[in-house]
Curated annotation (Swiss-Prot):
Functional note: The proteasome is a multicatalytic proteinase complex which is characterized by its ability to cleave peptides with Arg, Phe, Tyr, Leu, and Glu adjacent to the leaving group at neutral or slightly basic pH. The proteasome has an ATP-dependent proteolytic activity.
Record protein name field: Proteasome subunit alpha type-2
GO cellular component: cytosol; nucleoplasm; proteasome complex; proteasome core complex; proteasome core complex, alpha-subunit complex
UniProt entry tagged with the keyword Cytoplasm: yes
Family under the similarity heading: Belongs to the peptidase T1A family.
Main location as per UniProt: cytoplasm
Subunit structure: The 26S proteasome consists of a 20S proteasome core and two 19S regulatory subunits. The 20S proteasome core is composed of 28 subunits that are arranged in four stacked rings, resulting in a barrel-shaped structure. The two end rings are each formed by seven alpha subunits, and the two central rings are each formed by seven beta subunits. The catalytic chamber with the active sites is on the inside of the barrel. Interacts with Rpn6.
Length: 234
């Protein structure tokens, strides 16, 4: 009963020291589509499952992997509408930085500012936490970066990670397969294999999305390129 009294209050701690609404937001992430991020020696890859609930759905009308700036990409696990708002805000942050300083925003600066926005939604009245975790990848200072930001506003730098449904199995798989010597193509293969760990049904170029970032910038792979990668995996 004590927990129930605090479960609908965002700004009140429970007696055990928890913000229960944050735990609910993390539950939304844990039930969301699996997403994976892997740093390679010459780039970084992010990938996610993007299954459609109906064959009548217009494929590729809504993307889960999004470009934020020329050298930064983002993917999520959790609630799609919340993600759309964060994509919009992240792009605005990147553009404002460029207009102010006349140079592209560093990946770490973007992550910090997006995470600050997410944190503000954990201690403000009349709002709720974002029901998403983000993987933000990018390239600057001649090297790749990969960060994860959670509904609490906490963020971490990773070499490789998985989130969403079956995240524990995904991380276990990555711990066995990851190497800092991975080339970008090998990292894409590893990301696909990680998604396959908990994938139900047949994986095709239409039900996963992949983004890569290297010294040439960020791009979301088209279905034809993904199909080629899938063909090379037994």
């Amino acid at each position: 009963m004590a927990t129930e009294r605090y479960s609908f209050s965002l700004t009140t701690f429970s007696p055990s020291g928890k913000l229960v609404q944050l735990e609910y937001a993390l539950a939304a992430v844990s039930g969301g589509a699996p997403s994976v991020g892997i740093i390679a020696s010459n780039g970084v890859v992010i990938a996610t499952e993007n299954k459609h609930k109906s064959p009548l759905y217009e494929q590729h009308s809504v993307h889960r992997v999004e470009m934020i700036y020329n050298h930064i990409g983002m993917v999520y696990s959790g609630m799609g509408p919340d993600y759309r708002l964060l994509v919009k805000q992240a792009r605005k942050i990147a553009q404002t930085y460029y207009l102010t300083y006349k140079e592209p925003i560093p990946v770490s600066q973007l992550v910090q500012r997006v995470a600050t926005l997410m944190q503000e939604y954990t201690q403000s009245g009349g709002v709720r936490p974002f029901g998403v975790s983000l993987l933000i990848c990018g390239w600057d200072n001649d090297r790749p970066y990969l960060y994860q930001s959670d509904p609490s506003g906490a963020y971490f730098a990773w070499k490789a990670t998985a989130m969403g449904k079956n995240a524990v199995n995904g991380k276990t798989f990555l711990e066995k397969r990851y190497s800092e010597d991975l080339e970008l193509d090998d990292a894409v293969h590893t990301a696909i294999l990680t998604l396959k760990e908990g994938f139900e049904g047949k994986m095709t170029a239409d039900n996963i999305e992949i983004g890569i970032c290297d010294q040439n910038g960020f791009q979301r792979l088209d279905p034809a390129s993904i199909k080629d990668y899938l063909a090379s995996i037994p």
